Amino acid sequence: MTGFMIGLLAVGVVVVLFLMYLVGLYNNLVALKNRFQNAFAQIDVQLKRRYDLIPNLVETAKGYMAHEKETLEAVIQARNGAMAAEKHASANPGDAKAMSNLSTAEVALAGSLNRFIGLAEAYPDLKANQNMLALQEELTSTENKVSFARQAFNDAVMNYNTACETFPGNVVAGFGNFQKAALWELSEPAQREPVQVKF
C-alpha cells in the first residue's frame, strides 16, 4: 500500500466520522424537538382536564349565584378563548405567536376564575356544597399539574434551543430547518400564581 492510498483512506475515515457526527447532531435535534412537543402534549392533557372542570363548577354554582350571571358567562367565555388558543398552540408547540396567544388567554381565564371563586365565597350554601368542594379540589390539583407540566415544557424548550443555538448544532439546525421554539412564559405576575381556591 502506498502513502497516497493510506492518506486517501485516512481522509475517507475522517469524512465518514464527520458525517456520522453530523447525523448524530441532526438526530439529537430531532429527539430534543420531539421531547418539547411531548412536553406540550402533557400540558395539553392537563389544560383539557381543567377546561372540562370549569363548566361543572359554573353549573354547580348557577343555582346559588343566579344574580352573578355576568361573572358565570365571563368564566365560560374565557374558557372558550383559552380552549381555542390551546388548540392552536397544540398544533404549533413552541411557535412564538401561538404560545403568546395561549399565555394571554390563560391570563384571562385565571382572572375570570379568581373573580368567580371570590364571589362564590360570599355564598355560604355554595361553600358547603360537597360537589363544589370536590370540583374545587380537583381544580387545585389540576392547576398544580399544569404548573409542573409547563415547567417541564420550558425545560425541554431550553434544551432544544440551546442545541439549536450552539456550534456546531446551529449549522445543522440551519440546514435541517430547525426553528427556535418559544417558551410558555406568563405575561402577568398574577398569572404566575395558581388560581386561588379556598373555601
What do the PLM-derived regions correspond to, one by one?
Residues 2-199:
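A helix-centric hydrophobic-segment signal that preferentially recognizes long
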